[in-house]
Curated annotation (Swiss-Prot):
Domain of life (superkingdom): Eukaryota
Tissue expr: Widely expressed with highest expression in thymus.
GO BP terms in the entry: sodium ion transport
Self-association state and partner proteins as the record states: Component of the commander complex consisting of the CCC subcomplex and the retriever subcomplex. Component of the CCC (COMMD/CCDC22/CCDC93) subcomplex consisting of COMMD1, COMMD2, COMMD3, COMMD4, COMMD5, COMMD6, COMMD7, COMMD8, COMMD9, COMMD10, CCDC22 and CCDC93; within the complex forms a heterodimer with COMMD2. Interacts with NFKB1/p105. Interacts with CCDC22, CCDC93, SCNN1B, CUL3, CUL4A, CUL4B, CUL5.
Recorded family membership: Belongs to the COMM domain-containing protein 3 family.
Protein name: COMM domain-containing protein 3
Residue ranges constituting the COMM domain according to the UniProt record: 124-193
Record-level GO cellular component terms: extracellular region; ficolin-1-rich granule lumen; nucleus
Keywords: Cytoplasm, Ion transport, Nucleus, Sodium, Sodium transport, Transcription, Transcription regulation, Transport, Ubl conjugation pathway
InterPro entries in UniProt: COMM, COMMD3
Primary localization: cytoplasm
Subcellular location: Cytoplasm; Nucleus
Main function: Scaffold protein in the commander complex that is essential for endosomal recycling of transmembrane cargos; the commander complex is composed of the CCC subcomplex and the retriever subcomplex. May modulate activity of cullin-RING E3 ubiquitin ligase (CRL) complexes. May down-regulate activation of NF-kappa-B. Modulates Na(+) transport in epithelial cells by regulation of apical cell surface expression of amiloride-sensitive sodium channel (ENaC) subunits.
Amino acid sequence: MELSESVQKGFQMLADPRSFDSNAFTLLLRAAFQSLLDAQADEAVLDHPDLKHIDPVVLKHCHAAAATYILEAGKHRADKSTLSTYLEDCKFDRERIELFCTEYQNNKNSLEILLGSIGRSLPHITDVSWRLEYQIKTNQLHRMYRPAYLVTLSVQNTDSPSYPEISFSCSMEQLQDLVGKLKDASKSLERATQL
């Protein structure tokens, strides 16, 4: 697992008993799992009274580092020995390593389901439909009459059985800009395949 320097620093701060006592460490670890696995979780998970003495910037940095490591561990399907080795490298003590591994094992199945639902490929555009709409906006200062295009992209994702649609509204200039960029992308792709 390769983690950025920022994540490593945040994780090392989390390992420091002077920054996070045992209770604060447990609360932050559970908050990291909760924020990843619970769709209704919000920033309030970090508002526990036992975390108030910690600088909010440090708290959020360590929370993000823990969440990143949890996701990476889940992505690589890390086992207890892999987790322990990395945590030891980050100067975690035995008690914190055991707590982290236990919490990870308790949430491993939910984490794998979450990661599996994200998918591995970008959606593929299969169809485009559009219609012209005329917008009339009036107020006391001015009137604006202009055409707008309602564009709907039908997409298909190989990882997901559902085929959602992406809809947006744009002006003629924005649509021309989009078409120009798509033509440029198409030409670049053609050149790349000819090499």
